[in-house]
Amino acid sequence: MSKLPVISGRDCLKTLEKTGFRLRRPEGSHMVRRRVEPYAHVVVPDHRELDRGTLRAILRGAGVTVEEFIALIC
């Protein structure tokens, strides 16, 4: 299992946008993104650093593996 990087919520969103996620709506300190095909809905907190457990839960909801996510960051 690959080790998750420590990244900000905004960097997480930029990476998820590469997989087809688009802005649904900003909601205070959280940002909601949605992908139509295959359908997925994620809520990402706008924090400077996301906890690894939070990032893992976001990736699970997005249907993206840790390895795919790390490859998209690079």
Provide a role label for each language-model segment.
Residues M1-C74:
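Basic nucleic-acid-binding interfaces
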